[in-house]
Amino acid sequence: MAEVLLGVNIDHIATVRNARGTHYPDPVQAAFVAEQAGADGITIHLREDRRHITDRDVELLKKTIQTRMNLEMAVTDEMVDIACRIKPEFCCLVPEKRQEVTTEGGLDVIGQKDKVAAAVKRLSDAGILVSLFIDAEHRQIDAANEVGAPFIEIHTGAYADAKNEVEQEKEFHRIKAAATYAASKGLTVNAGHGLTYHNVQRIAALPEIYELNIGHAIIGRAVFSGLTAAVADMKTQMRKARR
């Protein structure tokens, strides 16, 4: 079985920096360290309120990342304009609410199909591979396929936040079924949100999963063990799942 890829989300390096309005820690340096430790790509979310990653970060990271940039963004004209100018390798369209602490759910592709389709077309025409961050629902997968996105990213938050084993098992099987269904439609399947060192292996073991995007758990561990070790440890957990 092919190795599952790891996209390291470095948003929270910027969160720490912005908490004091300093120039450090720098997400550009974090991306370099993560890549050296085995990250297959770097994920950043340029939010409309610029609460962590800034336009400056996006510009510099595009010039310095040695692997692949995955730019998460809302479905807005401003963000599509930025992406078409920067030209990251990947864009992941996500829902966004100003008052949320983190992304709370998947993108409702069905409810805004025309808007999403237009964004997908503009990004694709610019040579960018597009992913849609959606819940593990067949109807949303069908809609993602219909608007022309080649990738989806399954929202794993409900699985990660499950209160007990029964609930987690139910959510795992939803993700598993969604991954199988999406792959049968010809979509490439990524997953992410809330994954940790303790719950990542079951998701990484699913043969349809191409890449996992993980940030908070890695940055949290990095506080105590360093970013190099934190990224390497996550890669180890993911590799174990594919043995």
Swiss-Prot record:
Keywords carried by this UniProt record: Cytoplasm, Pyridoxine biosynthesis, Transferase
Site (Transition state stabilizer): E153
The protein's name: Pyridoxine 5'-phosphate synthase
Residues forming the catalytic site: H45 (proton acceptor), E72 (proton acceptor), H193 (proton donor)
Pathway where this protein functions: Cofactor biosynthesis; pyridoxine 5'-phosphate biosynthesis; pyridoxine 5'-phosphate from D-erythrose 4-phosphate: step 5/5
GO biological process: pyridoxine biosynthetic process
Annotated positions binding 3-amino-2-oxopropyl phosphate: N9, R20, G194, G215, H216
Catalytic activity: 3-amino-2-oxopropyl phosphate + 1-deoxy-D-xylulose 5-phosphate = pyridoxine 5'-phosphate + phosphate + 2 H2O + H(+)
Enzyme class: transferase
Keyword Transferase annotated: yes
CC annotations in GO: cytosol
Family membership noted in the UniProt record: Belongs to the PNP synthase family.
Binding residue positions for 1-deoxy-D-xylulose 5-phosphate: D11, H12, R47, H52, T102
Protein role: Catalyzes the complicated ring closure reaction between the two acyclic compounds 1-deoxy-D-xylulose-5-phosphate (DXP) and 3-amino-2-oxopropyl phosphate (1-amino-acetone-3-phosphate or AAP) to form pyridoxine 5'-phosphate (PNP) and inorganic phosphate.
EC number assigned by the record: 2.6.99.2
MF-aspect GO terms: pyridoxine 5'-phosphate synthase activity
Organism: Photorhabdus laumondii subsp. laumondii (strain DSM 15139 / CIP 105565 / TT01)
CDD domains: PNPsynthase
Subcellular location: Cytoplasm
Gene3D superfamilies noted in UniProt: Aldolase class I
SUPFAM superfamilies: Pyridoxine 5'-phosphate synthase (SSF63892)
Subunit structure: Homooctamer; tetramer of dimers.
